[in-house]
Amino acid sequence: MIHKLTSEERKTRLEGLPLWTAVPGRDAIQRSLRFADFNEAFGFMTRVAIKAQEMNHHPEWFNVYNRVDITLSTHDADGLTERDIELALFIDRAGAHAQPAA
């Protein structure tokens, strides 16, 4: 069974993810990124998809043109786990050149 983060673990781990925000009404985090164009956005999504498949942990996401919205939560644990933190850190590195979406 996957360990859901405690309130204290969640607080500590999320301090290292300042670009992510809590999803109202869910134990989940979200981030939106804006790229130069669709090709950049799709390339980013491809890199994340490869990592997610390696981790067997898949994001909820939505893409329109150059914008990618991502939500992370672990369904098996009904909330945030270390897997979400690991994937969020990878997403931050992979999307380092992106702008925050408004």
UniProtKB/Swiss-Prot annotation:
EC number, as in UniProt: 4.2.1.96
UniProt keyword annotation of RNA-binding present: no
SUPFAM superfamilies, sorted: PCD-like
Top-level EC class: lyase
Keywords assigned: Lyase
Molecular function in Gene Ontology: 4-alpha-hydroxytetrahydrobiopterin dehydratase activity
GO BP field: tetrahydrobiopterin biosynthetic process
InterPro entries the UniProt entry points to: PCD_sf, Pterin_deHydtase
Reaction it catalyzes: (4aS,6R)-4a-hydroxy-L-erythro-5,6,7,8-tetrahydrobiopterin = (6R)-L-erythro-6,7-dihydrobiopterin + H2O
Keyword Lyase: yes
Domain of life: Bacteria
Family: Belongs to the pterin-4-alpha-carbinolamine dehydratase family.
Record-linked PANTHER family: PTERIN-4-ALPHA-CARBINOLAMINE DEHYDRATASE (PTHR12599:SF0)
Protein name: Putative pterin-4-alpha-carbinolamine dehydratase
